[in-house]
């Protein structure tokens, strides 16, 4: 029997994802939000013209989870149609953006697919959550830095004040 995701975990995941999308929209106000179908089937959250980007929240520099298979056992987001993956990374002051194709190739070359391991041992090895058909691996920020496309897009440092709409600056 498959277990569902707890309400608390789903809520935390939604909040962190929602925060990442809010930050992304502030960095790229011209980006067009994808449709629900594009998000689910193409793994694209935003469009910049004909270039798709998949935004990932809830990451740490020493814990970046890459989905090889989703919870249904289907190809994960690293095999999606987005051109870029944007990892929300507050420790870097913005989004770490890499080519999805480069990340996929990095995983092909460096991730050991031969056996499943426990979560604590999942660095460049495969892990599957209990009662799920997913396959994920853990990378770290230094791994992403080796990709030629690696770039950090700083967070937007301004916002509109709710009283009057004056432009305010964070720093």
Predicted regions mapped to residue ranges:
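Nucleic-acid endonuclease domains
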Residues: 1-171
């Amino acid at each position: 029997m498959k277990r569902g995701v707890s309400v608390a975990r789903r809520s935390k995941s939604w909040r962190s994802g929602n925060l990442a999308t809010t930050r992304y929209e502030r960095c790229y106000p011209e980006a067009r939000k994808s449709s629900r179908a594009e998000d689910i089937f193409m793994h694209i959250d935003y469009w910049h013209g004909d270039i798709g980007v998949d935004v990932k929240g809830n990451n740490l520099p020493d814990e970046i989870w890459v989905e090889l298979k989703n919870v249904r056992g289907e190809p994960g987001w690293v095999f999606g149609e987005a051109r870029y993956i944007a990892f929300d990374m507050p420790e870097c002051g913005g989004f770490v953006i890499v080519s999805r194709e480069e990340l996929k190739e990095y995983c092909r070359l460096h991730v050991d697919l031969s056996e499943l391991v426990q979560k604590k041992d999942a660095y460049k090895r495969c892990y599957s959550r209990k009662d799920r058909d997913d396959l994920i691996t853990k990378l770290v920020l230094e791994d992403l830095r080796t990709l030629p496309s690696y770039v950090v897009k700083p967070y937007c440092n301004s916002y509109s004040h709710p009283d009057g709409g004056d432009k305010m600056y964070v720093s």
